[in-house]
Amino acid sequence: ADVGPRLFNDAKPANAEIIDCRGQVLAPGLIDMRVFTGEPGAEHRETLASAGASAAAGGVTSFVVMPVTEPVIDDAALVSFVARRAEATARVRVYPAGALTHGLKGTQMSEIGLLKEAGAIAFTDADRTIASSLIMRRCLAYAANYDALVIAHAEDPALAGAGSMNEGAFAARMGLGGIPPAAEAMAVERDMRLVELTGARYHLGQVSCAAALDVI
């Protein structure tokens, strides 16, 4: 629909319904690129239907399902299942992402071509970083052959250790293990080099520090 202050010459038609939107936000439907659900495998926690209802309530009209499920979405049949199930039960558009590596273990590349053919719109190991640069290069190069999008979580796992938030005074006050900005910046730097090398389509799942922005 058209919107704007000068949409009508006389400000508003005589028969127009006026909806007071003061204090509200008018925007296109939001898209969430990183949603974790319980279905398949943990429907007691959350289903595609309940996730879709929550999304709709918050103004999200489309979301991408991460492959962190039980079993992991690293098989064409599971991609098809998620797509069909979401279409039948969810109130919003749901797009399945396939696992970039088998079992999200970061050691063996998934069948990207078959997963994309089944309906996967992107490939990711979700909140896990592929530690091996060789495996990451192979994944990006193979994905490039299919014009497939790779979504990455960039964080050097060895340097991040058991940290749970960015390193700093707030983490110290909360008694939480900190993650140095270098852990993210180093991983982003590696991925940027590999993207340049392979020509793959790449989406950085999250950026949480200025050091990573400097690399980008």
Task: Identify the residue ranges that each predicted region occupies.
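Alpha-helical scaffold segments that flank or form the walls of functional sites
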Residues: Q24-V25, G41-V94, H102-I121, R137, ...
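Short, ordered loop/turn segments at secondary-structure junctions
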Residues: R6, F36, P67-P71, A99-L100, ...
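Generic detector of well-ordered alpha-helical packing
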Residues: C21, M33-P40, A126, A154
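Histidine-rich, glycine-flanked metal-binding segment
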Residues: A1-G29
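Glycine/charged-rich beta-loop-alpha catalytic/anionic-binding loops adjacent to active sites
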Residues: I31-G38, A171-G177
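Histidine/acidic residue-rich metal-binding segments in metalloenzymes
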Residues: T107-I216
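Hydrophobic faces of well-ordered beta-strands that scaffold small-molecule active sites
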Residues: G29-V35, F63-V65, V94-G98, A122-T124, ...
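Short, structurally constrained coil/turn elements
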Residues: K12, A88-A90, T198
